């Protein structure tokens, strides 16, 4: 059971790291995530959200 938990935590951490690395910040200022959707689609990404006043785009959810 301990081995299963260790593997599960390791996979979770790796998936979080991969998800962060795949994201891309684009030079578009925003106040809400809705403002980023079109800009992220034009940049070739699927999803976008506003973080710290700039659009952060990711290829998957």
From Swiss-Prot:
> In which compartments does the protein localize?
Secreted
Keywords for the protein's UniProt record, in alphabetical order = Amidation, Disulfide bond, Ion channel impairing toxin, Potassium channel impairing toxin, Secreted, Signal, Toxin, Voltage-gated potassium channel impairing toxin
- Signal peptide range equals 1-23
Kindly name one Pfam family recorded for this protein: Toxin_2
Which SUPFAM superfamilies would you find in this protein's record?
Scorpion toxin-like (SSF57095)
Please list the GO terms describing molecular function.
Answer: ion channel inhibitor activity; potassium channel regulator activity; toxin activity
Q: Can you list the disulfide-bonded cysteine pairs? A: 30-50, 36-55, 40-57
Q: Which residues form a coiled coil?
A: none
Q: Which PROSITE patterns match?
A: SCORP_SHORT_TOXIN
Which residues are reported to carry the modification Lysine amide? Answer: 60
Instruction: List the GO terms this entry assigns under cellular component, sorted alphabetically.
Output: extracellular region
Tissue specificity, per the record, is:
Expressed by the venom gland.
Superkingdom in the source lineage: Eukaryota
Function as written in the Swiss-Prot or TrEMBL entry = Inhibits voltage-gated potassium channel rKv1.1/KCNA1 at nanomolar ranges (IC(50)=90 +-2 nM, reduction of current by 30% at 50 nM or toxin).
What is stated as this protein's family in its record? Belongs to the short scorpion toxin superfamily. Potassium channel inhibitor family. Alpha-KTx 03 subfamily.
Domain writeup: Has the structural arrangement of an alpha-helix connected to antiparallel beta-sheets by disulfide bonds (CS-alpha/beta).
Put simply, this protein is called: Potassium channel toxin alpha-KTx 3.18
Species of the source:
Mesobuthus eupeus
